[in-house]
Amino acid sequence: MSKAMISRENYLQQLIQFKDTDFIKVISGVRRSGKSVLLMQYRDYLQQQGIASENILYLNFESFEYQWVKDAQDFQQLIQEKMPSSQEKIYFLIDEIQFVEGWQKIVNALRVSFNTDIVITGSNANLLSGELATLLSGRYVEIKIYPLSFKEFLHAKNVDSQSRLVDKLYSEYEKYGGFPSVVMADEPLKETILSGIFDSIVLNDIAHRAGVKDTHILKSVILFLADNVGQLVNPSKISNTLTSERVPTSNHTISKYLDLLENAFLFYKAKQYDIRGKGYLKTNAKYFIVDNGLRRHAIGKKGANYANRLENIVFIELLRRGYSVDVGKLDSKEIDFIARKADEILYVQVAFEIPENTHETDNLLHIKDNYKKILITGKYYEQTEIDGIEVIYVVDWLLQ
């Protein structure tokens, strides 16, 4: 397999599962996480299934060829030019569709009026808000893609999970993250590639799309969040901190920028949930960055706090596994993560090492329900449980 084509088998199987259904498949995720490669792998799969090449239409709206397609009228013209005369099903693979204003109506018309199978990708969470949701009324399925998991990282390196190299490679993964192009690059180039990814997200996906002319405040917010991963924050706290550092701003501006950072999939928000009161606390939340490599690139040596990096890896992996994730509060005690999926609830504490005072497991023991509770550690221990709570080394957990 070429360096550019790291297999994303889990995501590919999700696409295949919905092939030839009425659902529009929406692949969403941060820039450079592998959405386009996944489209290419789906195209290869279709051809292997005997679908004729002329019945597969790939359109990339970031490419030079389609720069003229600005709105729904242009999009309709393009479809009329490209649509085969075949009576067979046409497979549309449409990359970075958010660059076309009003694309929703055209995609819905394709779904309704023609024999089609449609996959679209986008690097903005607003893709699935407002008009698309109304027009399609539940006729789409979202496939959320992230940078490589540690399992995928090892697979890309052709290293077995039982290899002695695993711990060494975890250190590389934890340092440089899981963006496919970074993973496959030689070490001297990794930093340069991360810099390019960071700039393209900040300048193209956030500042340019939202019309942010002065990026200084935006970058200051990013640096603050990256430096405070896993800390409870709110717009007022961020605004006051930046203002004290001679970056004058307002709560309103901070709130707007937080939304932009979430929409670009650069940061994910974990709301604080009161376990006893069974409700969300509105004041504070934690923010986690999509990739540890980007975090380290953004804040440099300040990012040496291993506990924060560990917590970030666990949070993103929980999202990758399909959980919705909150941070928990039980009276004065903090639960790092409450992860929910269908009827399942998982309580997670994260610690570099097992503290002598068993503080981390004590917090879990105070939760009086029967859902699973685990402690994920940054150091390896022979010990596998404390008072009935599973203790697992982060590398082993990532490889489950």
UniProtKB/Swiss-Prot annotation:
> Which family is annotated?
To M.jannaschii MJ1544 and MJ1637.
InterPro entries this protein is in?
A: AAA_14 (IPR041682), DUF4143 (IPR025420), P-loop_NTPase (IPR027417)
Question: Any idea what this protein is called?
Answer: Uncharacterized protein HI_1038
Q: Which Pfam families match?
A: AAA_14, DUF4143
Q: Which organism is it from?
A: Haemophilus influenzae (strain ATCC 51907 / DSM 11121 / KW20 / Rd)
User: Domain of life here?
Assistant: Bacteria
SUPFAM superfamilies recorded: P-loop containing nucleoside triphosphate hydrolases
